[in-house]
Amino acid sequence: MGILPLIWLLGGPWRDHGTDSLAVLKAARRAQQAFEATRRANLPELPGSATGMCDERIGRLCYWYEGGLDTTPEEPPRIRDARVKLLATLASAAEALPGDEWIVGQRIRYLVEHQAYDAALHVMASCRATLWWCEALGGLARHAAGDFAGADSTFAAALRDMPEDERCRWTDISLLLEGALAKRYKRLDCAGRETFAARWWWLTRPLYSLGGNDRRTEHYARRTFARIEEDTRTTFGLYWADDLRDLVVRYGWATYWTREPPTSDLVRSEPRISGHEPSPSFRFAPSEGAFDNPGGAKPDDWALDSRHARDRYAPEYARAFVPLDHQAAVFRRDDSCVVVAAYDLSHDTLFTDDSVAGALALAADEQTVAIARDSGLIYGTRALTVTAPCQPFVLSLEARAPREHHVARARYGVATAAASPEQVEISDLLLFDPPDSVRDDLSAVIPRAYGTTRLATPRRLGVFWELYGARQGSDSTPATMALTVTREGGGGWLRRAAQSLGLVGPHRNVRLEWQELPPPGPIAPRSLVVDLSDLAPGRYLIEVGVAPAVGDRVTARREITITR
């Protein structure tokens, strides 16, 4: 952007303090309508952009999602030049009517569209409209610029300062809910809905490792954008109505538009215009089960790639958002839990850049998040540990390639509880690449932990676990321990037929059993190296069972897949 256009964006080319307010506002509205007419007349043509295949019909509108990486066409110079002139007109109108909400809203909307974020923030610094509206516009500008933490704080201030009935409308998430959650939400009063929404936003947050909840700031940015567009002529050529508002709140606003080529040179008609939201986009909302019991949530309680999603969001930092293969285990320390998580992106074709930023977050609620961060080269396994109180929490392991804009995430619940001093307990199993000499110590095992449970025919597999309360007082009776590796499933019909004919042997399993006297003390670390070289590729269950002299038998399990 040149210097002259920037001056136009901020200050305008002319000032007329003698113009009456109504005339100024009418002129500004005519300028906005004229710009949208110019935009419609100069949109790039895209055959087949209006397919008629709708995922959702919302009033007058047809919405569909094609997926894939978006390729935004270059904006025609005529549209860009016309926007600069509109912004100059709006800047002049703002000089005459500095407190007008419609004018300042249009300035922010078109500055954000122009990607002039610094100019938008400059405008907000001198905003003289209603306080909460200025704050909401500032939240929109900060969110669009990628300052999610700043946007979160600014929107929080706007919600605090707006009238109660307005706040109830802005915090309403009914358009984003479906099924049983939608029915439950509908029965709540405003205060109950705010409590419900706080929990929902916590579980909907895409990455706990980023400052601010960008899915929530996206929602309030959409609410702000929808209010800006009220009583305006839109790019579609339609006047604003509830269907356009619902579309924006659920799927966001279009970042570019295209039109269908004319069907005939003889008949002139209004062009068929398609708005294009950013892609790929995802649904980050939790299932009802995860909402009610976060500590028991499963990975598939977040269906990011749902084809017919109730809502969508395309984070600017994620051209891809994929599951993260990993291994995680929980170990006790008094009333705290140590969570170890390891991942390995060496063979992930999405992560071709050398560097990755990783994080392990344990979220008991929105305000209680323990997090460890890590960054470095993608080659080899990276392990992170977090210590937090033993309680149910959501585990979120996150890896991000900032330059490639790729994200991988593993998220699910972990239902830990305080240890019982009178009961023998066992930790999770942690698989590792064993050295020649194995030391029974968690800190020694973590650097060698596998970043996956898919193992390429390992000859030797290290298995680490801890026992708690296994030897109480002066008890000197040994405990019986066993480790088994068992093939899951019986194989396909072809293998069963070959086995019945004696062409192949039965699946091999591994079983080790021994007795030992646990050492005194609250924690008894143990590790064992198992030879798996005779096992065929497939899915297996590793189980460690301990039968103490007093008390019930305890077990820990880990599923693995052996590949060639």
Residue ranges and their predicted role:
Residues 187-317:
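A cross-family detector of function-defining hotspots
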